[in-house]
Each structure stands twice: as C-alpha cells, then as structure tokens.
A protein has these predicted regions:
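Short, glycine-/Ser/Thr-/acidic-enriched flexible segments
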Residues: 324
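Catalytic alpha-helical scaffold of carbohydrate-active enzymes acting on polysaccharides/glycoconjugates
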Residues: 2-228, 233-282, 299-321, 329-350
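A conserved mid-domain beta-alpha-beta active-site/ligand-binding segment of alpha/beta enzyme cores
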Residues: 287-288, 292-294
Length: 350
C-alpha cells in the first residue's frame, strides 16, 4: 500500500475527527457514473488505439462502458447473497448521469448546438435485448440498488462542443465512433470529464440550468426526488449548493477535498462529515474500493484497512466504488475481477 505524505495524512486525520460521530458500524457503498457513455464499444476502443490515442493509460477509457443488463444482473447476484446481522442485503447507492449526447442531432446541426437524450434511450440504442431499465427496477424493489443524482451529463459541454467545431485532437473521428472525448492528457486523465468546470459566468449559468434539468429528469424517470448528489470529479462552484437545495437535494456526497471552480482558477476546500452549508449537509467518502484501478487483492485489503480506520474514529465507512469495476462489455475479465473482489470484500464484512 502506498502511504500518503505526512502532511496529507495528518490533514485527513484532522478532518476525520471533526463532525458527526457514531458508535454504530455503518457501511455505505457509493458508486458513480451509471447511465453514462464512456467508451462506446470494444470495436471503437480497438479503432481508437490504432489511431494512436493512448487510451491504455486510463483504466476508465479502456474498460468503462454503458452498463448492460448482464452487468447489472451479475452485480445484483453478488449483493443478494449477503446479509448483515439485521437481515439487510448490501445496497449500492448508484449515482446516475441522466443523459448522453444525441450524436445524430448534433451532427445534423453541424456541431452548432448541443442535444441530448435520456440514458434509457441510450440503453435502447445500445442493447438489442434492452432489459436494463427492468433490472434497475428489480434492484430498487429488492433494496439492492438505489439511484441518486450524479449529473445531467458527465462531460464539459462547452469544451467538448468547441473541440468538435474545431476538430481538436481529431475529435470528430472520436465523435463518429460514439465517444465523448478520449483525449488523454499527460497525467492519464480525460480532459473533458469535468462537467462543472465553468470558465465564464455564461458557462456557470449553463451548469446551474443543467443541474435543475437533471434533477427534474431524475424525478420523472425514477418517480422520487434524489436527496443526495455528487458533482463529477468533486469539482463544482459552491454557489451551486443553492441550486441543489432548491431542487430538493439535502446532502452532497463527496471527498475530503472539493475542487472549487472559479472561472480561471481552482481552489481546494476541505469538508468533513456532517458539515452544513447553504442548507446542504456534506457526506465524506473515507474508504476506497476500486479493483479496476488497483487490482483485486490490493483493493480488498485497502478497503478493509479504510473500514477499520473509519470505525476506529467513530465514523461510518463510506466506500467509493465506481461503475467501471463491474462492467464487462469491453473487457470481460474486468467485470470478473471486480465482482470476485466484491464477493471477497463482502465475505469479510458481512
């Protein structure tokens, strides 16, 4: 296990001692990115590699894809095997991206305007035997899978559309393959996924409207309000808290660190569990379970360490585990690794 620098460890420990405590041993799974396109397909990935894009440097670009019915069924099959001492199954808080680009409409308008489609329409386009929405409903009814709000879209619309108009990095070739940007920067990250990275007041107004629209679409699709939300990549302007609250959000999921986007600069803001701002409570993730990134055994051991540390400090164990860990349409071995690791983790904690 790689240890953080001392100052970072100290800072994290200090924050973890602040705020809400409990003697109860709660374990919470939070999983981001459901409903969103990342890599469109295995064939698209192969073509992009052949074009020279360094997609292998990013585990998300080379493994993550829109979830299929098979992906969800296998995840639910693991969850339903386990119960706590009260007879409750583990439940995944699944943070949904509500829409994806409508590629045909955008192309028809020659990249002059952005158009989107709700994620269930994307399911219909992707999967011939489209049973994904049915399985999501089964997961909700079985208290195994509970949707919450992530974003309307998980990419920066302004940056992406500008890149399409200018064909930056051959973006239109990637667009034709059904991908939402796969330009990998020198750190191995995707430059387009920071959805709330506003550079101007106009962009911030657009983001505010996207949150309003996204939360209303969430209610229309699922039939209940999302009481929590999480900003993509933990990056948002704190003025957006008022928008979240106005639309019924009571708590923001997140990390110890918020990256606040203030146009041309980014500020780092510390948060602790139970902190309140503009009527919004903060929930802070203090455990990591990412077998796709870390490998199965390391991911299990790291998560168990984090859980024990959370309990030692009188905190619930709030586990971050992204969708990519359970997706097998592009790389079947990735899903096998993720689900096997989840099975081992649950055997240890249930």
């Amino acid at each position: 296990m790689k240890y953080l620098p001392f100052i970072s460890r100290f800072d994290k420990l200090w924050l973890s001692r602040m705020g809400w405590h409990t003697k109860q041993r709660y374990i919470i799974f939070e999983s981001d990115d459901w409903g969103a396109i990342r890599m469109s397909s295995k064939s698209s990935l192969d073509k992009i590699r052949n074009l020279g894009y360094q997609v292998n440097r990013n585990k998300y670009e080379s493994n993550d894809c829109l979830e299929s019915g098979e992906d969800l069924s296998r995840l639910l099959e693991v969850l339903i095997k386990f119960k706590d001492e009260c007879g409750n199954n583990p439940i995944i808080t699944a943070n949904f991206v509500m829409s994806n680009p409508d590629f045909e409409k955008i192309r028809a308008q020659q990249f002059s305007n952005y158009y989107s489609e709700p994620f269930y329409r994307t399911y219909e386009r992707y999967w011939s035997n489209n049973n994904v929405s049915t399985i999501i409903e089964q997961g909700i009814n079985s208290t195994l899978f509970y949707p919450q709000f992530h974003a309307r879209e998980h990419f920066n619309v302004f940056s992406w559309m500008k890149a399409l108009r200018n064909n930056t990095y051959g973006m239109r070739t990637l667009f034709d393959l059904g991908c939402v940007g796969t330009h990998i920067n020198e750190l191995g990250g995707n430059d387009y996924v920071r959805a709330y990275n506003a550079r101007t007041r106009n962009e911030l107004d657009f983001i505010e409207k996207s949150i309003e629209d996204g939360l209303r679409l969430f209610y229309k699709i699922f039939g209940f309000q999302s009481k929590t939300a999480i900003a993509p990549n933990y990056l948002w302007n704190k003025c957006l808290n008022r928008t979240y609250r106005k639309e019924g959000v009571e708590m923001l999921q997140g990390s110890y660190r918020q990256i606040e986007s203030e146009y041309s600069k980014h500020n780092k803001i510390s948060h602790y569990l139970g902190e309140r701002s503009n009527g919004i409570f903060y929930s802070v993730r203090n455990c990591i379970f990412e077998p796709c990134q870390m490998g199965g055994n390391k991911a299990v051991q790291r998560c168990l360490y984090d859980i024990n540390n959370a309990f030692r400090l009188g905190r619930p164990a709030i586990i971050c585990s992204h969708r990519v860990n359970y997706i097998g349409s592009i790389n079947p071995k990735n899903a096998i690794n993720g689900l096997d690791s989840l099975n081992i983790l649950l055997e240890q904690i249930c």
